[in-house]
Amino acid sequence: MKGSTSLYRKVDLIDTTGATDIANTDYDGAKPVAPGGKLADGVVAAKLSPFLDINDNAQLNRFGLHNGAPNDKNNLSEKWEAMGLVPALDPANPRDFFLIVGNDNDFMTQDGFQAGSSYKEESGADLDTRLLVYRITIPALAN
């Protein structure tokens, strides 16, 4: 974050084909896999492809939302911690899915109910739980 602006909030595609499986190796414990920021010899990284930039203000603005000032109810909060993928079930577009990205309010509310009683967050903060839903096409895997 820089002020109220998130610098990185993205969904990326990761291809593990050809990547080194470090499970049950020395790298699966205390041995660093990238000492000094360089992968150890013989270790091949997974491939990362940028897919969706949640911070895209042009798209957020279409729905009255934004990334950055003013820090109001329509500014996306900082932590987006949930993701789900649901098939669109569209026979004409079988690779289409709904990507649901969400964040909770971390109990920062003025109208909460927990453990059998009402509460108000001490700082006065009142954050909404929010879900963003995208219809996406997942690219076919290369053979």
Stretch-by-stretch model annotation:
Residues 1-143:
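Sequence/structural signature of beta-propeller domains
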